[in-house]
Amino acid sequence: MIIELGHYALVLALATAIIQGVLPVLGVRRGDPSLMGLAANAALVCFLLVAFSFAVLTFAYVTSDFSVKNVWENSHSLKPLIYKITGVWGNHEGSMLLWLLILVFFSAMVALFGRNLPETLKANVLAVQAWIATAFAFFVLLTSNPFARLVPAPGEGRDLNPVLQDIGLAIHPPLLYLGYVGFSVCFSFAVAALIEGRIDAAWARWVRPWTLAAWTFLTAGIAMGSYWAYYELGWGGWWFWDPVENASFMPWLAGTALLHSALVMEKREALKIWTVLLAIMTFSLSLLGTFLVRSGVLTSVHAFATDPTRGVFILAILVVFIGGAFSLFAFRASHLKAGGIFAPVSREGALVVNNLILTTATATVLTGTLYPLVLEALTGDKISVGAPFFNMTFGLLMLPLIAVVPFGPLLAWKRGDLAGAAQRLFAAAALGLLAAAICYYAVNGGPVLAPFGLGLGVYLILGALTDLVLRSGLGKVAAGVAWRRLSGLPRSAFGTALAHIGLGITLIGIVTVTAFETETVVEMKPGAVVDVGRYSLRFDGMREGRGPNYTEDAGHFTVSRGGVEVTEIWSSKRLYSARRMPTTEAGIRTFGLSQLYVSLGDDMADGGIVVRIWWKPLILCIWGGALVMMAGGVVSLSDRRLRVGAPARARKALALDHDDFRSDRPKIINVIDSKG
């Protein structure tokens, strides 16, 4: 009976979403506050209904209710509890319900924290959110019902794909969806503003926190997905330019551009049309990613094998929402007034360059991802666009972007001093070149671009720190005064610096592991020794083991350095009982920021086994940098001036330019300190 209650709750959520999408819009047209006020209440009710529905499905998984088809297809009574729970979203139907839950969650957050929004704008934003929720609720109920019953109920389930039985699955999809779906709020704000014909600095101020939150979650989701693929799939790589990986990366690139564009709009009321377009594009790319994963057009470890009719349904949603939003944009954009004028050399100019490069990079990834699909649809020819294309084109685009990033915070709004900014960045650039030279000579030449890329990473990190040092006046005033000035800076300044530092750390990791990792493929018998990097690995033999729902053959390796044993590594091949599906579990040991990675291959007729061993220098910088970027997003969100629904006093503080906090403006600092 409880399963039917979950299904009925989903139907009621659909009805509530329809009410939320219709009546508040009528209220706006009629100027009726009571109808407009329905939007917030309906959003909260819709969230509670979908949350109840999701809880029911989770209960069915935990109790192994195999009368539910979705549970039977993706669970097993022997599966550990954590994987029973994560199995809820380890399949198409359950993950779509999670998608819908997060969508209505964001609607509820707008309803709760958007109290200071203009009543008409809030009603329109929640109405657009409801239109999206209505479409996906119909999609779930009509094509992807997670509550379908099996009669009679099977005695045992088929189990979840063993590759997905990993703790990473508990974290990766929810984070990814929080990023994907979080951009729906930006989309709804853009559509609502176009409907009202009013877009100004206040609009950008309202959009920025939602953009920042979605960007932070998406950064976390992509990083977690990359690390999961690295350690779980046993292939030794961290990014494959898989079409589904690209489908999450494109909204991240566009969302990064939107963050910077919204800042220009907030400060100078410039780039209005462009910012609205980016808000629409970012969520459109999220919807495109949903289509690619669930339409059946891709074969990927990330994709769900689905009925093509589901792809047609999602394609219809794409056409309606993306086509409708762009049509509205084309009709209303010409009515938007142009914003402030600025010189090419200014902070606005640097952010425009940032936007141009990021959108070009997004278009490049989009072209490389969709071109094989379009070509196959038109001609029947199958081609693949692989890593060499993306590495070359995307890498070349990132070089000028990274060179420009440290200049942005050092340039003034409206008109900046390029020579002055370059002079202030001289030390960062010099130390970056020094790091590149040291790297080049340390590896006895080698690829020139690798030391150059490492030097760029160092330059980016030091450039971000330079901005904070200059704002505090460190070295020009007493240490106590510099500390007070530094602590008086807005948290968003620290968030920006952390995000740029994180990008630099990630760049160092990418360049180092790409250029200098070593791979050894060798047949080993017990007692065999192989040298990898600075370490020696001795194969000690295989041992059989058993887990809760699998058996495994685990290989034991002893790691030595300079003849001294330092650690051991276990790498295994598992066979899961229910599906009889083998998996490879890599053995990984960390040394500082570098890792030894061991993966077992095929058994040989002479009693040996093929072993693949990688030495991956500084690979943890890739995900460590992502963590720092995420921390930057969280710190920026904690800035009271950027909180949704911030009080008027805090909103007024936004009028203070970040340049007011530099060391040459002590009066402003003193005023802020006096206010506490």
UniProtKB/Swiss-Prot annotation:
Localisation per UniProt entry: Cell inner membrane
Disulfide bonds: none
Protein's GO biological process: cytochrome complex assembly
Family matches, as InterPro entries: CcmF_C, Cyt_c_assembly, Cyt_c_biogenesis, Cyt_c_biogenesis_CcmF
Signal peptide: none
Pfam families documented for this protein: CcmF_C, Cytochrom_C_asm
Transmembrane segments: 8-28, 42-62, 94-114, 123-143, 175-195, 210-230, 233-253, 273-293, 311-331, 356-376, 393-413, 418-438, 445-465, 493-513, 617-637
Keyword Oxidoreductase found: no
GO molecular function terms listed in the Swiss-Prot or TrEMBL record: heme binding; heme transmembrane transporter activity
Annotated Gene Ontology cellular component terms: plasma membrane
Keyword annotations from UniProtKB, A to Z: Cell inner membrane, Cell membrane, Cytochrome c-type biogenesis, Membrane, Transmembrane, Transmembrane helix
This protein's record includes keyword Cell membrane: yes
Membrane topology classification: Multi-pass membrane protein
Family: Belongs to the CcmF/CycK/Ccl1/NrfE/CcsA family.
Role according to the record: Required for the biogenesis of c-type cytochromes. Possible subunit of a heme lyase.
Annotated protein name in UniProt: Cytochrome c-type biogenesis protein CycK
Originating organism: Rhizobium meliloti (strain 1021)
